[in-house]
Amino acid sequence: MKHIRNFSIIAHIDHGKSTLSDRIIQICGGLTEREMAAQVLDSMDLERERGITIKAQSVTLDYKSQDGQTYQLNFIDTPGHVDFSYEVSRSLAACEGALLVVDAGQGVEAQTLANCYTALDMNLEVVPVLNKIDLPAADPDRVAQEIEDIVGIDATDAVRCSAKTGVGVPDILDRLVRDIPPPEGSPDAPLQALIIDSWFDNYLGVVSLVRIKNGTMRKGDKIKVMSTGQVYNADRLGIFTPKQIDRDVLNCGEVGWLVCAIKDILGAPVGDTLTLARQPAEKALPGFKKVKPQVYAGLFPISSDDYEAFRDALGKLSLNDASLFYEPESSTALGFGFRCGFLGLLHMEIIQERLEREYDLELITTAPTVVYEVETTAKETIYVDSPSKLPPLNNIQELREPIAECHMLMPQEYLGNVITLCIEKRGVQTNMVYHGNQVALTYEIPMAEVVLDFFDRLKSTSRGYASLDYGFKRFQTSDMVRVDVLINNERVDALALITHRDNSQYRGREFVEKMKELIPRQQFDIAIQAAIGNHIIARATVKQLRKNVLAKCYGGDVSRKKKLLQKQKDGKKRMKQVGNVELPQEAFLAILHVGKDSK
């Protein structure tokens, strides 16, 4: 036990977590030179393409330290994006310490702070590391001072390293062994194992990543899931050295994987406790608090035959991603599908891409909305996560929208731009602190504005230097309206959006113009209208295609021409009564981007 160290690597996006993990694996000889690849832990092809970490990965390595002892390091590489902060908090629950990696060129950023506070709340030992000292722009002394000012950890003797070149990485390992405490727990107590993560393997069924807090787990043990009381047989267990290695026993304090031939995806929920059937533990370990989705969107398969496959795919994915929420929903325009809850827009994009890639589905997404709290005239409080569920205007007493508290960090020269952006997003400033050249801003901004495109716009106004961390604060009364879209005088439920009354005129007009470009011209005029209740606020017309019926008349009587034109007109009129308009997939996607390019 004394020789086990469990730690996570936390940092802001692109500060070099995954590269540092590569170096640590290399130094400890987890993989041979031939098997080594850049960012070896980012195993999903989506992660490699976007160059970001999405899933936390765990690795067990043996490290010979300078005092001649061999230590077992269990470490978890975590994502840096604000949308995946739930992954980070789960990983931290399995550790006794964390490496806080900070880019020596860029300094402290918002996510660094957020993740670091999460670690400190869980009473973990935080070891600061200054990375990327090989860059010409690196200024480790200034950044060490910044860590002290902003985060409040003593960073004067922080390890300086360059994960890319490998300089200083052995020092990190020695510092780890010295500063991070060994796991507590007794090997003789009844087994308590925390499920940190689960995923579905087509051959093995459910594979769970567990951290043994007390007791030991052996191959062939009868294992009981504490929340459901079901008993399974531990068929295989082992560790990752990034490769899956089978072992016969997992000892107290270790992190490893377990296969119990669970077929049902709800068999081993993340955050649950496993114990032995013959001598169960008294009580379950404190799990993780369930995370509430911030953004909801409808996902619909393009062909309705895929509905079953789509349902299974969502089930398997939600096992792997505990923060995904879904329930069935049907729409007149799009058929059957699911209403899904996500932690943010990036999370939504990633889930959609994973469904399309890993499960070969073709999906349509409706515009994302946040959850509104509605008090009806009958004094009931209901939560609305989709525009179609909003009660009629005359039944609403008041509508409250969620407000997010946003913490932003940026260099001073971009302060003006960022404040302008926040005000445009209906934000209210609550705090502003200067730390040397950095400014920390706190704003309360409506969640609907944050999830739409705030992050992208923040990055572009500050040339990528500003960083953001946000969380739900409270519900607040506000004047929100539902804008419906009518095509040929028919409401299309999938296109409705909820927006603030001040922006409604503008959003409606822009929306209609955009739709006009996207709907292909038909044989008759198509009217596209945006309406609040029965009040039309914007309209555009897609002009019809028409054949030149007069081409065959050379000269001749005007009444002949009139007759032909009249006949064409009548034909178009008849078509318009029976014709319906097919909406292309681009039309739905364009709605997500309304307001992004135009401002």
UniProtKB/Swiss-Prot annotation:
Keywords: Cell inner membrane, Cell membrane, GTP-binding, Hydrolase, Membrane, Nucleotide-binding, Protein biosynthesis. GTP binds at residues 14-19, 131-134. It is a peripheral membrane protein. Coiled coil: none annotated. Its main location: membrane. It holds the Pfam family LepA_C. One of its GO terms (biological process) is positive regulation of translation. Transmembrane segments: none annotated. It comes from the Bacteria. The keyword Aminoacyl-tRNA synthetase does not apply. PROSITE patterns: G_TR_1, G_TR_2. GO terms for cellular component: plasma membrane. One of its GO terms (molecular function) is guanosine tetraphosphate binding. It is found in: Cell inner membrane. The keyword Chloroplast does not apply. Residues 2-184 form the tr-type G domain. It catalyses: GTP + H2O = GDP + phosphate + H(+). Its EC number is 3.6.5.n1. Belongs to the TRAFAC class translation factor GTPase superfamily. Classic translation factor GTPase family. LepA subfamily. PANTHER family: TRANSLATION FACTOR GUF1 HOMOLOG, CHLOROPLASTIC, TRANSLATION FACTOR GUF1-RELATED. Required for accurate and efficient protein synthesis under certain stress conditions. May act as a fidelity factor of the translation reaction, by catalyzing a one-codon backward translocation of tRNAs on improperly translocated ribosomes. Back-translocation proceeds from a post-translocation (POST) complex to a pre-translocation (PRE) complex, thus giving elongation factor G a second chance to translocate the tRNAs correctly. Binds to ribosomes in a GTP-dependent manner. This is Elongation factor 4. The gene is lepA.
